[in-house]
């Protein structure tokens, strides 16, 4: 496994651990399933969708990991920040 993918997977599991305070186990399991199938972008997209659709509140540490992940995966971290800013505690 490429070092970049190991870093992404480690960050995703770090994110999962932090989300235990605001996500249900079923929501976490859905994200974990994508990670297990190496669908890292879908895992992050699912986290974003759950936060928005379920009106979840997240802290800055969670947002920072999400931004770091999007940056590592060459996604638009600026757009992510704009989407998530309304959900910060």
Please provide the spans of the model-predicted regions:
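C-terminal-biased regions
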Residues: 1-89
